[in-house]
């Protein structure tokens, strides 16, 4: 019979600290031409806001010049900005959606 060697398993525990993703605010900017109803529609369709939330954000945009639609990781924020800007152009509105670091 062969001699069985003693196999030693060494486990190395590597603790990696996962950093939360950087978050970005998606912002709608006021202009003098985009109808308020269109802004409310954008907030409901792209940001899943109910009618009251959408109206409140729209009024903030109207009175303060801009309003926060939501805070997301960069990839999601960037996608929403692109989608909203394309939708606004398709509907011939100058509404501008942008993002900034939260």
Swiss-Prot record:
Protein name: ATP-dependent Clp protease adapter protein ClpS
PANTHER family for the chain: ATP-DEPENDENT CLP PROTEASE ADAPTER PROTEIN CLPS, ATP-DEPENDENT CLP PROTEASE ADAPTER PROTEIN CLPS1, CHLOROPLASTIC
UniProt-listed Pfam families: ClpS
Known function: Involved in the modulation of the specificity of the ClpAP-mediated ATP-dependent protein degradation.
Annotated gene: clpS
SUPFAM superfamilies: ClpS-like
Subunit relationships: Binds to the N-terminal domain of the chaperone ClpA.
SS bond partners: none
Species this chain originates from: Shewanella sp. (strain W3-18-1)
Family: Belongs to the ClpS family.
Domain of life: Bacteria
Signal peptide, first to last residue: none
Coiled coil: none
InterPro entries, alphabetized: ClpS (IPR022935), ClpS_core (IPR003769), Ribosomal_bL12_C/ClpS-like (IPR014719)
GO biological process: protein catabolic process; proteolysis
């Amino acid at each position: 019979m062969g001699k069985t060697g003693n196999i030693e398993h060494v486990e190395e525990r590597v603790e990696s600290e996962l950093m939360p993703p950087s978050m970005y605010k998606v912002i709608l900017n006021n202009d003098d031409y985009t109808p308020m109803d269109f802004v409310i529609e954008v907030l409901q369709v792209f940001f899943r806001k109910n009618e009251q939330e959408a109206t409140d954000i729209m009024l903030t945009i109207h009175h303060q010049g801009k309003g926060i639609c939501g805070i997301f990781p960069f990839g999601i924020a960037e996608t929403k900005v692109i989608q909203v800007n394309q939708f606004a152009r398709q509907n011939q509105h100058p509404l501008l959606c942008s993002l900034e670091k939260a």
